[in-house]
């Protein structure tokens, strides 16, 4: 009788964080009859600086169209702001242009069309904003806790996170004239030592420009000097003077992965799991899947540790690829960018031919022997 009574008790599920993984988890749980409670320390979903991000086939292989995948397989509906039909890759002395359907651009942060707001519009569960509830508090009151806080600090605090990189991110929203389906990426150690930089348009008149580079073991110029150098390069490349309307600067942003996806009845999702891909730093696809998979486990549709194994593998392959790129000096980067104008650009980057991160790392490995 006691066992039967315990099994019949309804789960009380707390989701700590109203970001991508937390909201995706809530949507799936609701579909299967559960009513999670969401605790968000800020005033709204995506209550932070506005920035652009991408979901591209390189991050979602073997899935070629992530939007269609989430819509058809999970009834999770998201809208991008534009598709990516042209990629321009820059190095110190080379430039290549690839004209292929490579993915989509979307908005994050404090914006009505951000991914966070789109997901929040699909959630019916109660969300407590300005929440001061700690993980320890929730653990005492709920049977299951989804850690979806948007950063890795809780996972680090619980000794369940391996840090691979601490990086600096500095970016801005700029006004100018842009092709909204064209993105730019820079690999240039004079701009972002052992890192990368990019320009992603919000519209025909606004774009997001960002530099990212690791902090450990580097003797580099100060952040301000690097940013000014990059800003001048962007203005020169775009052949216009760009007006900065908003900025953000993040230091010690952790890139890493959890040691165990689930400990007891706590699920580590999003950046607490390790959704941020080390190569180029985007992680929305993985973040959404961790939220979905945590919900699947709670609904008896799979085991979280098993479902997330391919995501762990994808993270490790991305880390290898980043390590390879970090070893490249500017002349090697020039050579690779020049090659993209030929076979690599016209065939390898097609969605139907693009290799997995693992395969791409093997292709590039001979360059850094």
Region annotations inferred by a language model:
Residues 41-91:
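N-terminal FAD cofactor-binding segment of flavoenzymes
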Residues 258-260, 296-342:
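Active-site-proximal substrate-binding core of FAD-dependent oxidoreductases
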Residues 21, 44, 152:
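Conserved Rossmann-like nucleotide-cofactor binding loop
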Residues 8-21:
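Beta1/beta-strand and adjacent pyrophosphate-binding region of the FAD-binding site
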Residues 220-294:
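FAD/FMN-dependent oxidoreductases across multiple families
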Residues 333-369:
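C-terminal auxiliary extensions adjacent to catalytic cores
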Residues 113-237:
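Predominantly flavin-linked oxidoreductase catalytic cores and closely associated redox partners
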Residues 16-18, 30-52:
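Glycine-rich FAD pyrophosphate-binding loop
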């Amino acid at each position: 009788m006691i066992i039967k009574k315990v099994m019949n008790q309804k789960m009380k599920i707390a989701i700590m964080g109203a970001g991508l993984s937390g909201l995706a988890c809530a949507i799936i749980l609701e579909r299967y009859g559960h009513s999670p409670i969401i605790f968000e320390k800020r005033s709204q979903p995506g209550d932070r600086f506005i920035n652009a991000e991408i979901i591209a086939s390189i991050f979602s292989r073997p899935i070629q169209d992530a939007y269609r995948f989430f819509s058809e397989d999970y009834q999770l509906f998201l809208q991008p702001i534009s598709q990516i039909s042209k990629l321009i890759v820059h190095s110190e002395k080379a430039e290549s242009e690839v004209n292929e359907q490579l993915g989509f651009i979307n908005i994050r942060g404090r914006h009505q069309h951000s991914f966070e707001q789109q997901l929040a519009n699909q959630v019916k569960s109660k969300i407590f904003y300005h929440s001061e509830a700690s993980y320890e508090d929730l653990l005492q009151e709920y049977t299951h806790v989804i850690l979806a806080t948007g950063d890795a600090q809780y996972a680090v605090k619980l000794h369940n996170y391996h840090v691979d990189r601490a990086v600096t991110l500095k970016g801005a929203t700029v006004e100018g004239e842009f092709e909204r389906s064209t993105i730019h990426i820079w690999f240039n150690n004079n701009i972002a030592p052992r890192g990368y930089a990019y320009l992603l348009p919000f519209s025909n008149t606004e774009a997001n420009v960002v530099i990212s580079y690791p902090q450990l073991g580097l003797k580099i110029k100060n952040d301000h000097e690097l940013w000014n150098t990059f800003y001048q390069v962007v203005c020169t490349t775009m052949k216009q003077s760009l007006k900065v309307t908003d900025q953000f600067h993040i230091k010690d942003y952790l890139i890493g992965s959890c040691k165990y996806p689930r400990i007891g009845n706590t699920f580590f999702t999003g950046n607490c799991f390790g959704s941020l891909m080390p190569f180029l730093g985007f992680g929305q696809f993985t973040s959404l899947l961790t939220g979905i998979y945590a919900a699947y486990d709670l609904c008896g549709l799979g085991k979280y540790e098993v479902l997330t194994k391919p995501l762990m593998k994808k993270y490790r392959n991305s880390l290898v690829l980043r390590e390879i790129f970090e070893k490249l000096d500017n002349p090697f980067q020039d050579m690779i960018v020049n090659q993209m104008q030929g076979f690599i650009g016209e065939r390898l980057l097609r969605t139907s031919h693009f290799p997995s991160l693992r395969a791409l790392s093997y292709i590039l490995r001979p360059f850094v022997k």
